[in-house]
C-alpha cells in the first residue's frame, strides 16, 4: 500500500488490538489514524483494549460523497464479507480472520 497524501477524501479500515475492524471516513488519513491511537478518535477506538490500531486498508476518492458512500457500504457488510472485500483488494487477511 503506497503512502497516502496528507489531504484528500478517504475511506479507511483499521485493525484494532482486540482483533476487530473499524471503518471510517476522513480528509486527513495520517492525522485521523494518529487521533485513533491517541484515544481521541471515534468512541469505538477510545476503548483502551482496542488500541493501538493499525491502518489496514484505505481508498482515496475525488469527493466526499464517494468516500462516505464507500464507508457506508463497507459498514453494512458482515465481518466475513468485509474480510473477503479486503482480500480481493490485496490485503493479506489470513492473520486477521479469527
Swiss-Prot record:
Family annotation (SMART domains): GIYc (SM00465)
Domain GIY-YIG: from-to ranges: 7-84
InterPro entries in alphabetical order: GIY-YIG_endonuc, GIY-YIG_endonuc_sf, UPF0213_domain
CDD domains in UniProt: GIY-YIG_UPF0213
Transmembrane intervals: none
Domain of life per record: Bacteria
Family per similarity comment: Belongs to the UPF0213 family.
This protein's name: UPF0213 protein in ldhD 5'region
Organism: Pediococcus acidilactici
